[in-house]
Amino acid sequence: MDRKRSRKFRWIRIFLWGLLLSAFLGQPVFSQSWEESFYEEQWGKSGAGEFIDSLPPEAVDPLTQRGLSPKDGASLSAEGANSIWQYAGDALLENMREPFQVFLQVAGVLLLCGIPLALQPGGKKLRTPEAMEFLGALCGMLLFLAPVSLLIQNICETIRQGTGILLGGIPVLCGILTASGHTVAGSTFSVVTAAAGNVVTLLTTSFLVPVLHVFLAISSISNLYPRMRLQVLCASLLKALRWTLVFAVSLYSALLSMQSALSSSADAVTLKAARLSVSSFVPVVGGAVSDAVSVVQASMGVLRSGIGSFAILALLILFLPGFFSCTLWVASGCLLEGLCGMLEMNRMKGFFHSCRDVLQTLLAFQASFCMIAVTSFALVLSSGGTGA
C-alpha cells in the first residue's frame, strides 16, 4: 500500500515539475509573440507605414539598399552611422565634378582676357581693353550663373521635401507619444513643429528664392556697370535675409526648449500619479497592472525610436548632397575671386564675391532648417525616454 502511494506521489511530482517547466519555457515565447503582434498593431494604427511610404525616394533608397529599416532598431543603431559616412563620401565625389568643370571653364575665360596684361611691354602699365574685359566678364557670369541658379532651385526643393518629412513624421511620433501617456508633450510638439514647418515653407517659396535671384541679378548688373552703384541695395537685401534667418531659428529654438521642459515635467507628474493610484487603490492586481502599463509604454517607445531614428537618417541623406554642393561652389567662387584679383579684373572680382555671399547664405539657410528638423525629432524621441 505504501509502495503504491509513493508511486502515486512520484507521478504527481513529475507532473507538477513538467507543468512548471513548460510554464517557464513557454513564457518567453508567449511574451515575444505578444510584443510582435502589439508592435505590428501599433505600426498600422499610428500611420507609420504611410509616413515611411511618403518619404522621398532619394532619402530612403540609400538606407534600404544598406539593409536599414525603421522596424529594426538594432540595425539602425549599429549601421546607421556607418551608412551615413559611406553615403557622405559618395555624395562628395558625385557633387565635386560640376563645380570643378565650371571653375576650369571660367578660369580659362579669365586667363584668355588677362593675356594682354601679361604680354604688355616692360615699363608700361596698360589696362585691359574695355571691350575684352566686358566680354570676359559677361561670359564668366553666364558660365557661373546658370549652375548657381539651378543649385538655388534644387536646394529650395530639398528644403520643401525636408519640410514634408517634418510635417509628416512629427504628428506620427506625437500620436505615439500621446498614446503612451505623454499627452502634454504630444500635443505641444505637434503644434510647434507644424507652425515651424509652415513658416519655413512660406519663407522658402515666397522669400528665399526671389530674394536670392534678385540679389544675383542686381549684383551682376552692378558689376557690369559700376556707375549704377547698386552694391548698397545688394548688401541690404542680403542683410535682411540673414537677419530673418537668425530671428526664425532663435524663436523656434526658444519655443521648443521652453515647451519641452514644461511638457516633460507635466507628463512625468501625471504618469507617476496614475501609477501610484493604480498600485495603491486597486487590490491584489494593482502592481501587475502598473507593470503592464510600463511594458506597453516601453513597446511604444521602441516603435517611436525606430521611426524617429529612420526619419533623422533620411533627413541627413536628403541634405548631405546640398551641403557638399554649396561648399564646393563657395570654394570655386573664392578661387575665381582670387584669380580675378591677380589679373586685376575688378568687375569679375566683385561678381564672384557676391556669388560667394549668396551661396553662403543658402548654405546657412539649409543648415539651419536641417538643424531645426533633426532637433525636433530628437526632442520627441527623448521625451519620456522609451517608456517613462
Residue ranges and their predicted role:
Residues 305-346:
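Helical hairpin unit composed of two closely spaced alpha helices linked by a short loop
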Residues 190-254:
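Loop-centered beta-sheet repeat module
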Residues 237, 343-363:
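Interfacial loop-to-transmembrane junctions
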Residues 1-17, 23-133, 147-161, 166, ...:
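Gly/Ser-rich, low-complexity
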Residues 165, 226-230, 341-349:
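Juxtamembrane helix-boundary/capping and inter-helix hinge elements in multi-pass membrane proteins
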Residues 138-147, 166-183, 203-211:
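Mid-bilayer segments of alpha-helical transmembrane spans in multi-pass integral membrane proteins
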